[in-house]
Swiss-Prot record:
Belongs to the dpy-30 family. Asymmetrically dimethylated at Arg-104, Arg-260, Arg-453, Arg-538 and Arg-615 during flagellum resorption. Probably methylated by PRMT1. This is Flagellar radial spoke protein 2. It is found in: Cytoplasm, Cytoskeleton, Flagellum axoneme. It comes from the Eukaryota. Residues 689-730 have a biased composition (Low complexity). Coiled coil: none annotated. It comes from Chlamydomonas reinhardtii. Keywords: Calmodulin-binding, Cell projection, Cilium, Cytoplasm, Cytoskeleton, Flagellum, Methylation. Residues 134-189, 357-426, 674-738 are annotated as: Disordered. Pfam families: Dpy-30. One of its GO terms (molecular function) is calmodulin binding.
């Protein structure tokens, strides 16, 4: 164990202090100091210090080497990353040039690239737009032009049926080249683009900058004519330098130093601004503007780096190439096909249906009759008051004659019979009601036929409208593609599109400009055209706006030249006018339906009145029969009473006659007595019994008038009795006288 331990210690000493001791001993031997131990100790202390210094040196050197190595690695990585970023940017920019999409989608893609690959706080793009033409305004001094006609032309007065629009002036022939200039025609120099009236319409913006889409950048208004000398005009916005000075790129390191920079929210900020014009390579015409900024607080407020500015420029160039390709494809699509033949067939079919509908409408509602003539479809005259019944008049005349006869008899001293009650005139409404029902039945039948014809006219007009919708829908894809690929506004088509959108009930603010109308170019447009209820009652305020739009449209030839592949402008205008025709026929049909309903209601009322009149007549006849029976019974009783009264009167008359005869006899006797010398007392005694006998005779009842033959014996009996009484009285008077 001991040797092993000793060897281990030796190894330990050799590894730790062996080299230092050996070198120290060698130094002591070489120096031969007086005190070798002290020398060795000092040398070892110095050796330790030197070792520390050397260690620090090598350690620092190693650290420096490591830092340099790290820096080199980082620089290499940064260079590689920069190369990768540059390659990625280049690939992204080059890829944009190959994108096949709509212009707005290309602008949105460019904005996303700028925002993604640069330090810009915001990016946005605008199209170079033309001002839209104003709508048509009705002249104040021409009332006829302000009135809507049946089938008026788009740009002016109405065309008569079968009338063709006036031919457009032929283009002037080009001047022939002068001698010596050669046979080849001189190349046409393109006319420079006039940007003086154009403005920037922003259509794409990065996230958080959506408010930019509601803004448009216009040129300032010209100074007023009565402006003072101190008037300071509004400066032209800085971005218009791209158009006016033909500058492909603008850059402002600090927008606070440039007064011409306009802020969307009217609040000044700090930061940089860059704008690149997007021009078509072939023509050099600026079609759009791509811009980016670092405005604080959305951005850093610092200037854009050179790499960022270069990338924005590269994106604008790629966008130019992509837009040119899109415009070329759109132009090819416009010229590749033509819907002229289909539209002509549609016009012929619609004209035929319109002619049939017009015939049905004319039959349903004929024109008003001339003055003095009687119309067929007029309402029946008012029901006249029915005349009194003839029987009632005859009874009334008989009653009046009887009354007159009674009055004449009363003049002779006899008591006149009582006047019969005057019978009321009874009107019979049944004949008048029957005549009215006959007229109303004829009117209802005529109204039914007119309503059926009006419905047929509406159906024919709707069929024509469906034909127009079918043609428009069959070209919907091509139409939408053409509309969405147009950067410049097609003025004529835009007027018709506005009229169509007004008609379909879209908010007016949503298509006040061509930029805003872009949101309506979707399949829903044609779905709404097919679903529109043309028979509903028209809102004339809306139709006034519709008319102001489509009357501003140009002639058909110019309108068709804007979209020759589908002729959407002409088809949409035909749709609007056909909707108006359907609406007008629907108004006629509703009027005739109302007349039919009224005629049917009047007929039902008259029929009900006839039933009621017949019921009242039956009740009245029953009542009259009852009253007649009662009157007949009363008349019979009255006749019987009259007969009795007549008999009594005759008896009274006979008694009176007898009394008179007795009186005469008494007078004769008195005269005879006077002659014989008898006094007046004897005559009075003879007259008293005669008056006593005549008094009861006056109270006797007279026999009936009809039984005068039967009463004659009684009269004779009374005469005989009176004569016997006279004889007896004379005998008594004689006895008294004796």
């Amino acid at each position: 164990m001991a040797p092993t331990q000793a060897g281990h210690d030796t190894a330990y000493l050799k590894e730790t202090v062996g080299e230092a001791l050996a070198r120290g001993c060698a130094a002591a031997i070489s120096a031969q100091p007086n005190d070798p131990v002290e020398y060795l100790g000092l040398w070892l202390l110095k050796y330790v210090k030197n070792a520390e210094v050397e260690g620090n040196f090598y350690r620092e050197r190693q650290q420096d080497l490591q830092k340099k190595k790290d820096r080199l690695v980082k620089e290499a990585q940064s260079e590689q990353a920069a190369k990768s970023v540059a390659l990625t940017r280049k690939e992204a920019a080059d890829a944009l040039a190959l994108v096949t999409a709509e212009p707005r989608e290309l602008l949105e893609a460019a904005v996303k690239l700028v925002k993604q690959h640069t330090a810009a706080g915001a990016a946005y793009a605008a199209v170079v737009a033309e001002p839209e033409e104003p709508d048509w305004v009705a002249p104040e001094d021409d009332e006829a032009a302000a009135v809507e006609t049946e089938d008026e032309a788009a740009g002016g007065a109405a065309l008569a049926e079968g009338e063709e629009p006036p031919p457009e002036p032929e283009p002037e022939p080009e001047a022939a080249p002068e001698d010596g200039e050669g046979d080849a025609p001189a190349p046409k120099i393109p006319r420079p683009v006039d940007y003086s009236k154009k403005y920037f319409a922003y259509v794409a913006a990065s996230a958080g900058q959506e408010h930019v889409l509601e803004a448009d950048l216009y040129r300032p208004a010209p100074p007023p004519e009565d402006a003072d000398e101190d008037f300071k005009p509004e400066p032209l916005p800085y971005s218009f330098r791209v158009l006016d000075e033909k500058l492909p790129m603008l850059y402002v390191p600090n927008v606070a130093a440039e007064e011409r920079v306009k802020f969307f929210r009217k609040f000044p900020k700090i930061g940089s601004y860059q704008a690149c014009g997007v021009a078509l390579p072939a023509s050099g015409e600026f079609k759009a503007l791509l811009a980016a900024d670092t405005l604080f607080p959305e951005g850093s407020g610092q200037p854009l780096s050179a790499d960022d500015r270069d990338f924005v420029w590269e994106v604008s160039q790629s966008l130019s190439r992509a837009l040119e390709a899109v415009q070329a494809r759109a132009a090819e699509a416009l010229a590749a096909t033509s819907a002229a033949e289909a539209v002509e067939e549609l016009k012929a079919k619609v004209a035929e249906l319109r002619e049939q509908a017009a015939a049905e409408a004319a039959a349903a509602a004929p024109p008003p009759p001339a003055e003095g003539e009687e119309g067929e479809g007029e309402a029946p005259p008012a029901e006249e008051e029915p005349p009194a019944e003839e029987e009632a008049e005859e009874e009334e005349e008989e009653a009046e004659e009887g009354a007159e006869e009674g009055a004449e008899e009363g003049e002779e001293g006899e008591e006149a019979p009582p006047k019969p009650k005057k019978k009321k005139k009874v009107f019979n409404p049944i004949p008048g009601l029957q005549a009215a029902i006959e007229k109303l039945t004829a009117a209802a039948e005529a109204a039914t036929e007119a309503d059926a014809r009006a419905q047929a006219a509406v159906a024919l007009e709707k069929q024509a409208l469906d034909e127009v919708v079918a043609l428009a829908s069959s070209h919907s894809d091509a139409t939408l593609s053409s509309l969405r690929n147009m950067l410049s506004v097609p003025q004529g088509t835009y007027h018709v599109v506005k009229a169509l959108l007004h008609l379909l009930g879209r908010p007016a603010a949503s298509f006040s400009t061509w930029k805003r109308a872009h949101s309506h170019f979707s399949p829903r447009l044609f779905e709404d055209m097919a679903a529109y209820d043309a028979t509903a009652e028209r809102d004339m305020a809306v139709w006034g706006r519709v008319r102001s739009c489509y009357k501003a449209a140009p002639a058909a030839k110019k309108l068709d030249a804007e979209m020759p592949n589908t002729l959407f402008g002409s088809v949409a205008l035909m749709y609007i006018k056909q909707v108006r025709r359907v609406a007008r026929k629907a108004v006629l049909q509703r009027e005739l339906a109302a007349k039919l309903a009224k005629a049917q209601q009047d007929l039902a009322d008259k029929q009900a009145a006839l039933v009621e009149a017949e019921r009242v007549k039956a009740e009245r006849e029953a009542e009259e029969a009852r009253l007649a029976a009662e009157a007949e019974a009363a008349a019979a009783a009255e006749a019987e009473a009259a007969a009795r009264a007549a008999a009594e009167a005759e008896a009274a008359a006979a008694a009176e006659a007898a009394a008179e005869a007795a009186a005469e006899a008494a007078a004769a006797a008195a005269e005879a007595a006077a002659e014989a010398g008898e006094g007046e007392a004897v005559a009075e005694r003879e007259a008293a019994p005669a008056e006593a006998e005549a008094a009861p005779a006056e109270g006797e009842a007279a026999p009936p008038a009809e039984g005068e033959g039967e009463a004659q014996p009684a009269q004779e009996g009374s005469n005989s009795s009176s004569s016997s009484s006279d004889s007896s009285s004379s005998e008594e008077s004689k006895a008294a006288a004796e």
